[in-house]
Design a protein with these regions (language model features):
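Short beta-strands and strand-coil junctions in structured, solvent-facing domains, enriched
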Residues: 42-47, 109-111, 225-230, 289-291, ...
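Amphipathic hydrophobic-ligand
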Residues: 14-38, 50-53, 116-130, 161-173, ...
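Transmembrane beta-strands of outer-membrane beta-barrel pores
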Residues: 6-9, 60-62, 107, 189-192, ...
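Flexible, surface-exposed loop regions and adjacent strand-edge segments
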Residues: 71-78, 202, 254-261, 378-379, ...
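Extended terminal
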Residues: 345-350, 355, 362, 373-449
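Elongated, acidic membrane-bridging lipid-handling scaffolds
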Residues: 1-4, 42-44, 49, 53, ...
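Outer-membrane beta-barrel proteins
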Residues: 65-67, 197, 248-250, 415-417
């Protein structure tokens, strides 16, 4: 047992780190009240130079990363060489084997010295690392290879504050097995720290997405961890997401940030710095609610994709894969506004300079008034009567231009127009226009579209 271990930078270093006068990126403060080695065979360690430990325990430890002002120049020291798991230098040993490393009631924090605030922290970090060892390289004394083939990691119930302080991240369980090549995340929850989302919107300078995310289970299968560590290439066979509930709110009473332009999915992939290849992403039994708040309307515009299922194939930023000419595809099925079935297919060519993507879809029959939660706040139109028979649509788009066509079959349409920024007489006139000029049915009496 080792009690009350404390490692901390001195005040002079912290002062320089805060002012950006040091060549280091960060400082580390480490407090370990209890550090325990169990099952250590001292006789074997002395006679054979081999260390076998059944368990290492870190209890009530706190690791704090101290972030200062970005230094003008970062000097790379000889002892800052990149970590290579195939060639680890340790003099005087013939091998190390560790059964389990357990972290119990630990804390991890990132602290901003410049702004004097906590950026990231957690409540009670608990996890285990199992089954890994160091083996001496043959013919190369004092150099070892870290064997991770049977490594297992399990983290239970944890909560983190996300940088910025606007969100908390929770999960019930994270499990990783090197041998099975799987990573599982259960009970993931990302929620705002505000009870009222509009209170968070008041802090924002521009209109931006405010999220609430809950996921029952994420399973990542058949990935090359060694390739990720050594070469920074992320190759994954499949990602399965089950029970995703995604709520997005945008307060459109705030101005747009005209300096920021969101990228299309195919653009984002091609411009990724790290090579990524995912063969398949599947989303099952999920729910998406998108809302926009407008001036003058009490209720936000609401669009819902219920019972959402989606399949994404060939998501890659690897240049060799892109050069094959194969496209990323997205197939989506859901119940729009929780009622009529909606099917949409996307094709995202990756080997294209224009970044044009293509889509086509179909919406089944519904009562027109089922769309009022979207149409009334967005365009001031409330459907009184009418039956939608179907909508078919297709098109293409890129960052510069979009084009397409839509055919909408309906009957018995009757609507009211209520524009909040117009006078009552204008609204009466607009209602007359809507119900007189607009066709009540399509096809009409002449049976033409």
């Amino acid at each position: 047992n080792l009690k009350d271990l404390l490692i901390e930078p001195d005040t002079a270093f912290i002062k320089k780190l805060k002012a950006g006068e040091t060549d280091k990126k960060m400082g580390i403060e480490l407090s370990i009240p209890t550090f325990r080695l169990a099952g250590l065979n001292l006789y074997k360690a002395i006679t054979d130079n081999k260390i076998n430990i059944s368990k290492i325990l870190f209890k009530d430890a706190t690791c704090k990363l101290l972030m200062g002002k970005k230094p003008k120049k970062i000097v790379k020291h000889n002892d800052d060489k990149e970590f290579n798991i195939d060639s680890i230098y340790m003099k005087g040993l013939d091998g190390i084997s560790i059964g389990k490393i357990e972290f119990l009631r630990n804390k991890f924090e990132i602290y901003d010295l410049v702004n004097d605030q906590l950026i990231v922290n957690n409540k009670d970090l608990k996890f285990e690392l199992k089954d890994f060892f160091l083996e001496e390289l043959k013919g190369n004394n004092d150099y070892f290879r870290l064997h991770l083939e049977n490594l297992k990691l399990e983290l239970l119930k944890e909560e983190f504050m996300v940088p910025g302080g606007n969100y908390n991240l929770n999960f019930e369980r994270i499990y990783f097995s090197m041998a099975d090549s799987i990573l599982e995340i259960d009970g993931l929850l990302l929620k705002t720290t505000y009870n009222d989302k509009y209170e968070l919107a008041k802090k924002l300078k521009f209109t931006s997405e405010i999220y609430d995310i809950a996921v029952e289970k994420i399973k990542i299968s058949a990935f090359d961890l060694e390739g990720m560590i050594k070469n920074g290439i992320y190759i994954i066979d499949s990602v399965a997401v089950k029970g995703l509930h995604l709520d997005i709110l945008m307060d459109k009473r705030l101005p747009f940030n005209t300096d920021k332009r969101p990228k299309l999915p195919n653009q984002s992939l091609k411009q990724m710095r790290s090579p990524l290849y995912i063969s398949k992403i599947s989303i099952e039994d999920s729910h998406l609610k998108y809302q926009e708040k407008y001036e003058g309307y009490e209720e936000p515009m609401t669009a819902i994709l219920a019972d959402l299922n989606a399949q994404i194939h060939f998501a890659t930023s690897v240049k060799d894969s892109i050069s094959t000419g194969k496209s990323m595809t997205v197939n989506l099925q859901s119940n729009f506004m929780e009622k009529p079935p909606l099917h949409v297919n996307f094709i995202f060519p990756l080997d294209s300079r224009a970044d044009t993507f293509y889509f086509e879809g179909h919406l089944a029959s519904a009562k027109m008034n089922e769309f009022n939660k979207a149409s009334e706040p967005a365009i001031g139109v409330k459907f009184i009567k009418g039956d939608l028979k179907e909508i078919k649509f297709s098109g293409s788009a890129n960052p510069e231009i979009s084009k397409g066509s839509m055919t909408m079959l309906y009957s018995g349409l009757e609507a009211e127009v209520d524009k909040k920024n117009t006078e009552k007489d204008k609204n009466i006139f607009l209602c007359w226009v809507a119900n007189t000029v607009v066709h009540a049915s399509n096809p009409g009496k002449n049976n033409k579209l």
